[in-house]
Amino acid sequence: MPDPAIPQIPFIRRAGVCYARTARNLEIPVIDVSNPAFAVADDAQSVEALRQTSVGMMRRNARMPRFLLRMLIRAAAKRSFLARAMLRKADSTFLAGMDTYLIKLGADNLVPPFDTPSDRRFAAYPGIQGIRIRLQQTARLLAEALEPALSERPGAPLHLLNIGGGSAIDSLNALILLRRRTASLLQRPVVIQLLDPDTNGPLFASRALAALVARDAPLAGVDARLLHTSYNWDDPAPLQELVATLAADGALIAASSEGALFEYASDASVVANLEALYNAGKGASLVAGSVTRADELTRSGLQFTHFKLMPRGARVFADLIQGTGFRVERVYESLSSDQVLLLRETRA
């Protein structure tokens, strides 16, 4: 059941941007990383500049008395919805899907009631920019790896499995990038299989997809639909069954998990989910996702949140997944996460 509606004052919609409604009936932009309005510079030099800015902020915070720092954090949470979502929900061990989505919009794309000066300042922080880069890089990795796979199997149904993805915005953006590169590759049935215990994120995801496939929108003409299944990654049996069924039907299967499975799940759950995706070499051909970095900057930042992230970094993660049937093929670095592309191995 959607959450009760909350008031939203009229605002000017940006040309060339799609909009969809949340469970609370708020109209917000649909992120399209191919649109300059949402794109973030993610080259090595830009990421390093963000890192240095974050280091400077961390050092200033370290010199500040703890009671004063806590007071400033509480004050920020009172003035900014976005800050409140990240800093005050002490009963939650992860950032909810739609809260995460809102901070990915970027300061210039915020709409009422999330567009106060405090919200805009918060959305411009380096750590938030890093989360936007995380989305952009995950979508790019997925699209880049899918391009040759789709070329080899024209017309085969494409199923994008999104684990813990909330709004599935990484899957949607991978499709947008593919459409812009080679539109003919999406001349096939496309299904986003959204596996998430949440309901608000998937509801928005379905509405976002409807907006994207509308006339003159980025995915206009694409035969795409979204299916939501409530899923707990600590019990991968439903995933195993889904992958086996899709493989038997001859589908092309790819998976992603941006800001979810590889960042929050235990080692055992990460391994079990990858083994389910592998399906004895007949399942997903590739997986894209984000891994929390384990450097000093990331660990220092985590002390200001209540989220139970698992700082591993790409190297430790690569060791962890040995034997699952996947290997790390490519890594893109952001501020607090490494985005990884996993390719299926051929076992003897």
Model-assigned labels for residue ranges:
Residues 2-8, 12-18, 22, 58-69, ...:
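Alpha-helical subdomain
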Residues 2-153:
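Rossmann-like AdoMet
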Residues 8, 45, 52, 129, ...:
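Residue-identity detector for glutamine
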Residues 70-72, 110-115, 182, 246, ...:
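Short hydrophobic/aromatic-rich motifs at helix boundaries and adjacent loops
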Residues 103-109, 164-169, 291-293:
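Short glycine-enriched loops at secondary-structure junctions
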Residues 110-115, 171-172, 295-300:
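Short acidic/His/Gly/Ser-rich catalytic and metal-binding motifs that mark active-site loops
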Residues 120-249:
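Conserved adenosyl
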